[in-house]
């Protein structure tokens, strides 16, 4: 599982309960990371990456 995550970081990850989990990141970002294949523009000129990633969704973008 050395696949690059389709996002640099993720605050709102939605993952299945399977092992390993299959995750999507529903963050709205200014632009998708280079690794994202399926990047959709939102109504407010932001972007959401619709790629899925198998495994840990990685670090959050914002520390509370």
Swiss-Prot record:
InterPro entries: Bowman-Birk_prot_inh, Prot_inh_BBI. SMART domains: BowB. The keyword Hydrolase does not apply. One of its GO terms (cellular component) is extracellular region. Keywords: Disulfide bond, Protease inhibitor, Serine protease inhibitor. Disulfide bonds join 9-61, 10-25, 15-23, 32-39, 36-49. One of its GO terms (molecular function) is serine-type endopeptidase inhibitor activity. SUPFAM superfamilies: Bowman-Birk inhibitor, BBI (SSF57247). Gene3D superfamilies: Cysteine Protease (Bromelain) Inhibitor, subunit H. The record marks 17-18 as: Reactive bond for trypsin. The keyword Transport does not apply. Belongs to the Bowman-Birk serine protease inhibitor family. This is Bowman-Birk type trypsin inhibitor TI1.
